[in-house]
Regions:
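Extended, low-polarity transmembrane helix blocks
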Residues: 1-31, 56, 70-132
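Short hydrophobic/aromatic-rich motifs at helix boundaries and adjacent loops
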Residues: 16, 36-40, 59-61
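Membrane-interface interhelical connector segments
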Residues: 25-48
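Interfacial helix-start motif at the membrane-water boundary
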Residues: 43-60
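N-terminal alpha-helical segment
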Residues: 62-63, 108
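Generic transmembrane alpha-helix motif of multi-pass integral membrane proteins
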Residues: 64-70
């Protein structure tokens, strides 16, 4: 499991770091043409961007999480913390942005592999009656 976790950690870290930085620096989105999104996908992204705070905070968290995964610090925390972001990316790709589905599938698989690899760190969260 160690090689799988290492590859998943590095791929997910690079992906989050690259797309997080791209939001602020525009080095991918200005050079790589992304496939056209459906009207529903455009409406969804437009609605999210109307809240001016949403994308800057999300992308800052992606950068921090990506760096944490890449330098292997607090990996279990970042794997769990980034899972809702990864799940939203995956569901967006499934229901709205079909052309980007391979990226969403790869990200959800990498995040699931990390959650599985670090599962012993989450066991205490599922204690029914924790003792103080």
């Amino acid at each position: 499991m160690k090689p799988v976790a290492l590859i998943a950690r590095l791929l997910l870290g690079i992906t989050f770091l690259a797309f997080g930085l791209d939001f602020f620096l525009h080095f991918i989105s200005s050079t790589v043409p992304f496939p056209g999104l459906s009207n529903r996908a455009d409406d969804y992204l437009s609605a999210l961007s109307r809240a001016a705070y949403f994308f800057p905070i999300l992308k800052a968290l992606e950068i921090i999480g990506g760096l944490g995964l890449l330098i292997n610090r607090y990996t279990a925390l970042f794997a769990a913390g980034l899972f809702p972001v990864t799940l939203n990316i995956f569901l967006f790709d499934v229901f709205l942005g079909y052309q980007l589905l391979p990226l969403g599938v790869a990200m959800i698989l990498c995040n699931a592999a990390l959650l599985y690899a670090y599962r012993r760190y989450y066991k205490f969260l599922f204690t029914v009656r924790p003792a103080l």
